[in-house]
Protein backbone atom coordinates (compact mmCIF):
# COMPACT_ATOMS: atom_id res chain seq x y z
CA UNK A 1 0.00 0.00 0.00
CA UNK A 2 1.41 3.37 -1.02
CA UNK A 3 2.17 5.86 1.74
CA UNK A 4 -0.38 8.61 2.08
CA UNK A 5 0.82 11.90 0.63
CA UNK A 6 2.16 14.31 3.23
CA UNK A 7 0.49 17.60 3.93
CA UNK A 8 2.73 20.62 3.13
CA UNK A 9 3.43 21.09 6.85
CA UNK A 10 4.35 17.43 7.34
CA UNK A 11 6.50 17.40 4.20
CA UNK A 12 8.43 20.43 5.44
CA UNK A 13 8.88 18.82 8.84
CA UNK A 14 10.04 15.54 7.26
CA UNK A 15 12.65 17.42 5.20
CA UNK A 16 13.78 19.42 8.21
CA UNK A 17 14.15 16.29 10.36
CA UNK A 18 16.00 14.47 7.60
CA UNK A 19 18.49 17.33 7.33
CA UNK A 20 18.80 17.52 11.12
CA UNK A 21 19.61 13.82 11.47
CA UNK A 22 22.04 13.83 8.54
CA UNK A 23 23.92 17.05 9.32
CA UNK A 24 24.31 16.19 12.99
CA UNK A 25 25.13 12.52 12.36
CA UNK A 26 22.27 11.48 14.65
CA UNK A 27 21.22 7.84 14.73
CA UNK A 28 17.98 6.62 16.28
CA UNK A 29 18.44 3.20 17.89
CA UNK A 30 15.92 3.13 20.72
CA UNK A 31 13.30 5.06 22.66
CA UNK A 32 15.94 7.05 24.54
CA UNK A 33 17.20 8.51 21.25
CA UNK A 34 13.64 9.35 20.21
CA UNK A 35 13.00 11.10 23.54
CA UNK A 36 16.19 13.14 23.15
CA UNK A 37 15.15 14.35 19.69
CA UNK A 38 11.60 15.05 20.83
CA UNK A 39 12.89 17.17 23.73
CA UNK A 40 14.95 19.25 21.29
CA UNK A 41 11.98 19.68 18.96
CA UNK A 42 9.61 20.54 21.77
CA UNK A 43 11.96 23.14 23.23
CA UNK A 44 12.36 24.82 19.81
CA UNK A 45 8.58 24.85 19.25
CA UNK A 46 7.87 26.22 22.73
CA UNK A 47 10.55 28.90 22.50
CA UNK A 48 9.22 29.98 19.09
CA UNK A 49 5.68 30.17 20.46
CA UNK A 50 6.88 32.15 23.49
CA UNK A 51 8.68 34.65 21.24
CA UNK A 52 5.45 35.07 19.25
CA UNK A 53 3.56 35.71 22.48
CA UNK A 54 6.10 38.39 23.39
CA UNK A 55 5.68 40.00 19.94
CA UNK A 56 1.93 40.18 20.52
CA UNK A 57 2.44 41.53 24.04
CA UNK A 58 4.72 44.37 22.92
CA UNK A 59 3.03 45.00 19.56
CA UNK A 60 6.21 44.71 17.49
CA UNK A 61 8.57 41.94 16.43
CA UNK A 62 12.12 41.61 17.72
CA UNK A 63 13.90 43.90 15.26
CA UNK A 64 10.94 45.97 14.01
CA UNK A 65 11.66 49.07 16.09
CA UNK A 66 9.89 51.40 13.61
CA UNK A 67 6.50 49.95 14.67
CA UNK A 68 7.23 50.18 18.36
CA UNK A 69 4.41 52.01 20.17
CA UNK A 70 5.20 51.12 23.79
CA UNK A 71 7.78 52.15 26.36
CA UNK A 72 8.18 48.49 27.32
CA UNK A 73 10.82 46.32 25.61
CA UNK A 74 12.49 42.93 25.64
CA UNK A 75 14.93 42.16 28.42
CA UNK A 76 16.66 38.92 27.47
CA UNK A 77 15.58 35.50 28.62
CA UNK A 78 15.34 33.38 31.74
CA UNK A 79 15.78 29.64 31.78
CA UNK A 80 13.23 27.16 33.03
CA UNK A 81 13.37 23.39 33.40
CA UNK A 82 10.27 21.69 32.05
CA UNK A 83 9.37 18.12 33.03
CA UNK A 84 7.78 16.53 29.97
CA UNK A 85 6.73 13.06 28.88
CA UNK A 86 10.08 12.90 27.01
CA UNK A 87 12.19 13.88 30.03
CA UNK A 88 13.47 17.16 31.46
CA UNK A 89 14.41 19.98 29.10
CA UNK A 90 15.63 23.56 29.40
CA UNK A 91 13.75 26.32 27.58
CA UNK A 92 14.40 30.06 27.28
CA UNK A 93 11.54 32.26 28.47
CA UNK A 94 11.55 35.83 27.05
CA UNK A 95 11.39 38.68 29.57
CA UNK A 96 10.23 42.28 29.29
CA UNK A 97 11.65 45.27 31.17
CA UNK A 98 8.45 46.02 33.06
CA UNK A 99 7.83 42.42 34.08
CA UNK A 100 4.31 42.55 32.62
CA UNK A 101 4.67 39.60 30.24
CA UNK A 102 2.47 36.66 31.29
CA UNK A 103 3.14 33.76 28.89
CA UNK A 104 0.19 31.46 28.26
CA UNK A 105 1.67 28.45 26.50
CA UNK A 106 4.05 27.95 29.43
CA UNK A 107 2.56 29.77 32.38
CA UNK A 108 4.76 31.58 34.89
CA UNK A 109 4.81 28.88 37.57
CA UNK A 110 4.28 25.90 35.30
CA UNK A 111 7.22 23.51 35.23
CA UNK A 112 5.67 20.10 35.78
CA UNK A 113 5.18 17.19 33.46
CA UNK A 114 2.31 16.97 31.00
CA UNK A 115 -1.23 16.45 32.26
CA UNK A 116 -1.16 12.85 31.08
CA UNK A 117 1.97 12.11 33.12
CA UNK A 118 0.59 13.92 36.16
CA UNK A 119 -2.47 11.68 36.04
CA UNK A 120 -0.23 8.59 35.82
CA UNK A 121 1.79 9.72 38.85
CA UNK A 122 -1.34 10.50 40.89
CA UNK A 123 -2.80 7.11 39.93
CA UNK A 124 0.36 5.32 41.10
CA UNK A 125 0.35 7.33 44.33
CA UNK A 126 -3.30 6.40 44.89
CA UNK A 127 -2.41 2.71 44.63
CA UNK A 128 0.10 3.07 47.47
CA UNK A 129 3.33 3.19 45.47
CA UNK A 130 6.19 4.92 47.28
CA UNK A 131 7.91 7.91 45.69
CA UNK A 132 10.96 5.68 45.10
CA UNK A 133 8.76 3.16 43.26
CA UNK A 134 7.18 5.94 41.19
CA UNK A 135 10.59 7.37 40.28
CA UNK A 136 11.80 3.91 39.20
CA UNK A 137 8.61 3.23 37.24
CA UNK A 138 8.81 6.52 35.34
CA UNK A 139 12.50 5.96 34.62
CA UNK A 140 12.04 2.43 33.31
CA UNK A 141 8.90 2.97 31.24
CA UNK A 142 9.30 6.55 30.04
CA UNK A 143 13.01 7.31 30.50
CA UNK A 144 12.06 10.29 32.69
CA UNK A 145 13.88 11.38 35.84
CA UNK A 146 11.42 12.72 38.41
CA UNK A 147 12.45 13.80 41.90
CA UNK A 148 10.67 13.35 45.23
CA UNK A 149 9.90 17.07 45.28
CA UNK A 150 8.31 16.94 41.81
CA UNK A 151 6.10 14.01 42.83
CA UNK A 152 5.16 15.90 45.99
CA UNK A 153 4.29 19.05 43.99
CA UNK A 154 2.12 17.04 41.61
CA UNK A 155 0.25 15.18 44.35
CA UNK A 156 -0.11 18.42 46.36
CA UNK A 157 -2.59 19.50 43.69
CA UNK A 158 -4.96 17.06 45.38
CA UNK A 159 -5.04 19.04 48.66
CA UNK A 160 -7.46 21.81 47.51
CA UNK A 161 -9.70 19.08 46.09
CA UNK A 162 -9.58 17.25 49.44
CA UNK A 163 -10.50 20.47 51.26
CA UNK A 164 -13.44 21.05 48.93
CA UNK A 165 -14.55 17.43 49.45
CA UNK A 166 -14.30 17.79 53.25
CA UNK A 167 -16.54 20.87 53.13
CA UNK A 168 -19.13 19.68 50.59
CA UNK A 169 -22.83 19.83 51.59
CA UNK A 170 -24.33 16.62 52.96
CA UNK A 171 -27.81 15.08 53.18
CA UNK A 172 -30.21 16.37 55.84
CA UNK A 173 -30.87 12.93 57.34
CA UNK A 174 -28.75 9.79 57.49
CA UNK A 175 -30.24 6.46 58.49
CA UNK A 176 -26.96 5.21 59.92
CA UNK A 177 -23.52 6.76 60.40
CA UNK A 178 -20.55 4.54 61.26
CA UNK A 179 -17.63 6.24 62.99
CA UNK A 180 -14.21 4.76 63.69
CA UNK A 181 -10.52 5.68 63.64
CA UNK A 182 -7.51 4.08 61.96
CA UNK A 183 -3.96 4.81 63.12
CA UNK A 184 -0.75 5.67 61.24
CA UNK A 185 2.75 6.91 62.00
CA UNK A 186 3.76 10.35 60.73
CA UNK A 187 7.01 12.28 60.92
CA UNK A 188 6.55 15.55 62.81
CA UNK A 189 9.34 17.98 63.71
CA UNK A 190 11.98 15.27 63.54
CA UNK A 191 9.98 12.76 65.59
CA UNK A 192 7.73 9.88 64.58
CA UNK A 193 4.30 10.34 66.13
CA UNK A 194 1.06 8.40 66.03
CA UNK A 195 -1.88 9.93 64.21
CA UNK A 196 -5.53 8.93 64.27
CA UNK A 197 -7.50 9.24 61.05
CA UNK A 198 -11.14 9.78 61.99
CA UNK A 199 -13.55 8.33 59.45
CA UNK A 200 -17.33 8.74 59.14
CA UNK A 201 -19.36 6.66 56.67
CA UNK A 202 -23.05 7.40 56.23
CA UNK A 203 -25.96 5.50 54.72
CA UNK A 204 -28.64 7.91 53.53
CA UNK A 205 -32.38 7.28 53.42
CA UNK A 206 -32.07 5.88 49.89
CA UNK A 207 -29.63 3.25 51.13
CA UNK A 208 -26.59 4.78 49.44
CA UNK A 209 -23.27 4.56 51.27
CA UNK A 210 -20.81 7.47 51.29
CA UNK A 211 -17.66 8.53 53.12
CA UNK A 212 -18.72 11.75 54.84
CA UNK A 213 -15.24 12.73 55.90
CA UNK A 214 -11.71 11.70 56.88
CA UNK A 215 -9.76 13.81 59.34
CA UNK A 216 -6.17 13.52 60.59
CA UNK A 217 -5.78 14.28 64.29
CA UNK A 218 -4.01 13.29 67.48
CA UNK A 219 -4.75 9.98 69.21
CA UNK A 220 -8.46 9.19 69.08
CA UNK A 221 -10.49 11.29 71.52
CA UNK A 222 -14.15 12.13 72.13
CA UNK A 223 -13.26 15.83 71.99
CA UNK A 224 -12.03 15.55 68.40
CA UNK A 225 -15.11 13.52 67.46
CA UNK A 226 -17.22 16.33 68.90
CA UNK A 227 -15.61 18.80 66.48
CA UNK A 228 -16.22 16.39 63.59
CA UNK A 229 -19.88 15.98 64.53
CA UNK A 230 -20.28 19.76 64.68
CA UNK A 231 -18.67 19.90 61.24
CA UNK A 232 -21.22 17.42 59.87
CA UNK A 233 -24.02 19.57 61.27
CA UNK A 234 -22.54 22.71 59.71
CA UNK A 235 -22.49 20.90 56.36
CA UNK A 236 -26.24 20.33 56.48
CA UNK A 237 -26.80 17.16 58.52
CA UNK A 238 -29.86 17.73 60.70
CA UNK A 239 -30.41 14.23 62.03
CA UNK A 240 -28.72 10.84 62.31
CA UNK A 241 -31.13 8.05 63.21
CA UNK A 242 -28.53 5.57 64.48
CA UNK A 243 -24.81 6.07 65.12
CA UNK A 244 -22.56 2.99 65.25
CA UNK A 245 -19.35 3.53 67.21
CA UNK A 246 -16.61 1.77 69.15
CA UNK A 247 -16.32 1.87 72.92
CA UNK A 248 -14.32 5.10 73.19
CA UNK A 249 -14.99 6.84 76.51
CA UNK A 250 -17.11 9.96 76.06
CA UNK A 251 -18.14 9.14 72.48
CA UNK A 252 -21.88 8.73 73.26
CA UNK A 253 -21.88 12.05 75.13
CA UNK A 254 -20.21 13.79 72.17
CA UNK A 255 -22.90 12.46 69.81
CA UNK A 256 -25.70 13.43 72.19
CA UNK A 257 -24.34 16.98 72.47
CA UNK A 258 -24.75 17.56 68.70
CA UNK A 259 -27.51 15.11 67.73
CA UNK A 260 -29.53 14.56 70.93
CA UNK A 261 -32.13 12.25 69.32
CA UNK A 262 -29.62 9.86 67.76
CA UNK A 263 -29.74 6.22 68.87
CA UNK A 264 -26.26 4.93 69.73
CA UNK A 265 -25.14 1.38 69.01
CA UNK A 266 -21.78 0.42 70.46
CA UNK A 267 -20.02 -2.14 68.28
CA UNK A 268 -20.46 -5.67 69.66
CA UNK A 269 -17.31 -6.95 67.94
CA UNK A 270 -15.19 -4.19 69.53
CA UNK A 271 -16.71 -5.02 72.90
CA UNK A 272 -15.93 -8.73 72.51
CA UNK A 273 -12.32 -8.03 71.50
CA UNK A 274 -11.73 -5.54 74.29
CA UNK A 275 -13.17 -7.72 77.05
CA UNK A 276 -11.67 -11.09 76.07
CA UNK A 277 -8.11 -10.15 75.12
CA UNK A 278 -6.68 -11.43 78.44
CA UNK A 279 -8.63 -14.70 78.57
CA UNK A 280 -6.40 -17.78 78.52
CA UNK A 281 -6.36 -19.74 75.27
CA UNK A 282 -7.64 -22.87 77.04
CA UNK A 283 -10.75 -21.10 78.34
CA UNK A 284 -11.39 -18.78 75.41
CA UNK A 285 -13.60 -21.15 73.39
CA UNK A 286 -16.11 -22.04 76.18
CA UNK A 287 -16.17 -18.43 77.41
CA UNK A 288 -16.89 -17.13 73.90
CA UNK A 289 -19.69 -19.67 73.51
CA UNK A 290 -21.32 -18.40 76.71
CA UNK A 291 -20.83 -14.78 75.63
CA UNK A 292 -22.47 -15.50 72.28
CA UNK A 293 -25.61 -16.57 74.14
CA UNK A 294 -25.76 -12.94 75.34
CA UNK A 295 -25.32 -10.97 72.12
CA UNK A 296 -27.11 -13.50 69.87
CA UNK A 297 -30.19 -13.69 72.11
CA UNK A 298 -33.55 -13.06 70.37
CA UNK A 299 -34.65 -10.38 72.89
CA UNK A 300 -33.03 -7.97 75.30
CA UNK A 301 -34.70 -9.65 78.28
CA UNK A 302 -33.20 -13.03 77.39
CA UNK A 303 -29.83 -11.40 76.68
CA UNK A 304 -29.80 -9.76 80.10
CA UNK A 305 -30.64 -13.08 81.79
CA UNK A 306 -27.82 -14.76 79.85
CA UNK A 307 -25.44 -11.99 80.95
CA UNK A 308 -26.35 -12.61 84.58
CA UNK A 309 -25.62 -16.31 84.05
CA UNK A 310 -22.31 -15.45 82.41
CA UNK A 311 -21.46 -13.24 85.38
CA UNK A 312 -22.10 -16.04 87.87
CA UNK A 313 -20.02 -18.55 85.89
CA UNK A 314 -17.00 -16.47 84.88
CA UNK A 315 -16.62 -13.51 87.23
CA UNK A 316 -14.55 -15.52 89.68
CA UNK A 317 -11.71 -15.61 87.12
CA UNK A 318 -12.61 -12.69 84.85
CA UNK A 319 -14.65 -10.17 86.87
CA UNK A 320 -14.09 -7.28 84.45
CA UNK A 321 -15.83 -8.92 81.47
CA UNK A 322 -19.40 -9.00 82.79
CA UNK A 323 -18.87 -5.66 84.55
CA UNK A 324 -17.88 -3.98 81.27
CA UNK A 325 -20.90 -5.43 79.47
CA UNK A 326 -23.23 -4.28 82.24
CA UNK A 327 -21.67 -0.80 82.45
CA UNK A 328 -22.09 -0.30 78.69
CA UNK A 329 -25.37 -2.18 78.33
CA UNK A 330 -27.46 0.88 77.40
CA UNK A 331 -25.47 1.39 74.19
CA UNK A 332 -24.59 -2.26 73.56
CA UNK A 333 -28.22 -3.40 73.62
CA UNK A 334 -29.75 -0.81 71.27
CA UNK A 335 -30.04 -3.27 68.37
CA UNK A 336 -32.39 -5.57 70.31
CA UNK A 337 -35.29 -3.18 69.75
CA UNK A 338 -35.09 -3.56 65.95
CA UNK A 339 -36.05 -6.40 63.58
CA UNK A 340 -33.38 -8.71 62.18
CA UNK A 341 -32.59 -6.72 59.01
CA UNK A 342 -31.76 -3.55 60.97
CA UNK A 343 -29.86 -5.56 63.58
CA UNK A 344 -27.57 -7.03 60.93
CA UNK A 345 -26.82 -3.53 59.68
CA UNK A 346 -25.96 -1.87 62.98
CA UNK A 347 -24.73 -4.28 65.63
CA UNK A 348 -21.15 -4.21 64.31
CA UNK A 349 -19.05 -1.59 62.54
CA UNK A 350 -18.14 -4.07 59.78
CA UNK A 351 -19.10 -1.46 57.17
CA UNK A 352 -16.36 0.91 58.23
CA UNK A 353 -13.88 -1.79 59.25
CA UNK A 354 -14.08 -3.26 55.75
CA UNK A 355 -13.31 0.19 54.36
CA UNK A 356 -10.38 0.53 56.78
CA UNK A 357 -8.95 -2.82 55.63
CA UNK A 358 -8.99 -1.59 52.05
CA UNK A 359 -7.18 1.58 53.11
CA UNK A 360 -4.51 -0.50 54.86
CA UNK A 361 -3.93 -2.51 51.68
CA UNK A 362 -3.07 0.71 49.88
CA UNK A 363 -0.96 2.23 52.67
CA UNK A 364 0.92 -0.92 53.76
CA UNK A 365 4.05 0.13 51.83
CA UNK A 366 4.34 3.30 53.95
CA UNK A 367 5.48 2.59 57.50
CA UNK A 368 5.92 6.31 58.20
CA UNK A 369 4.36 9.23 56.30
CA UNK A 370 6.48 12.39 55.91
CA UNK A 371 3.60 14.67 56.96
CA UNK A 372 -0.09 14.79 57.83
CA UNK A 373 -0.76 16.18 54.35
CA UNK A 374 0.95 13.26 52.59
CA UNK A 375 -1.12 10.83 54.69
CA UNK A 376 -4.36 12.63 53.85
CA UNK A 377 -3.49 12.77 50.13
CA UNK A 378 -2.95 9.02 49.91
CA UNK A 379 -6.06 8.18 51.94
CA UNK A 380 -8.23 10.50 49.85
CA UNK A 381 -7.00 9.02 46.57
CA UNK A 382 -7.48 5.50 47.94
CA UNK A 383 -10.99 6.44 49.09
CA UNK A 384 -11.90 7.71 45.61
CA UNK A 385 -10.73 4.41 44.12
CA UNK A 386 -12.53 2.27 46.72
CA UNK A 387 -15.86 4.11 46.52
CA UNK A 388 -16.08 3.76 42.73
CA UNK A 389 -17.58 0.35 43.47
CA UNK A 390 -20.19 1.77 45.86
CA UNK A 391 -23.02 1.88 43.36
CA UNK A 392 -26.67 1.31 44.16
CA UNK A 393 -28.01 0.49 47.61
CA UNK A 394 -28.05 -2.49 49.93
CA UNK A 395 -29.94 -5.50 48.61
CA UNK A 396 -32.26 -5.53 51.62
CA UNK A 397 -32.69 -1.77 51.82
CA UNK A 398 -36.40 -1.80 51.00
CA UNK A 399 -37.06 -3.92 54.07
CA UNK A 400 -34.74 -1.84 56.27
CA UNK A 401 -36.27 1.45 55.08
CA UNK A 402 -39.80 0.24 55.86
CA UNK A 403 -38.75 -0.76 59.37
CA UNK A 404 -36.97 2.54 60.01
CA UNK A 405 -40.07 4.45 58.88
CA UNK A 406 -42.06 2.68 61.60
CA UNK A 407 -39.51 3.19 64.38
CA UNK A 408 -38.69 6.81 63.47
CA UNK A 409 -42.06 7.93 62.13
CA UNK A 410 -42.00 11.39 63.73
CA UNK A 411 -38.41 12.18 62.78
CA UNK A 412 -39.00 11.08 59.18
CA UNK A 413 -42.40 12.74 58.78
CA UNK A 414 -40.95 15.65 56.80
CA UNK A 415 -39.40 13.43 54.13
Show the residue positions of the predicted features:
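Conserved beta-strand -> loop -> alpha-helix junction used to position metal-binding or nucleic-acid-contacting
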Residues: 242-249, 254-290
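Acidic/histidine-rich catalytic cores and adjacent linkers
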Residues: 3, 293-415
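DNA-recognition alpha helix
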Residues: 132-143
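RNase H-like nuclease fold core
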Residues: 94-97, 105-109, 144, 153, ...
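Active-site phosphate-binding and catalytic loops of NTP-dependent enzymes
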Residues: 55-71, 160-172, 184-189, 389-391
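Short, conserved DNA-binding cores of transcription-related domains
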Residues: 1-109
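Basic, short loop/linker segments at the boundary and entry of helix-turn-helix/winged-helix-like folds
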Residues: 69-127, 143-156, 172, 222
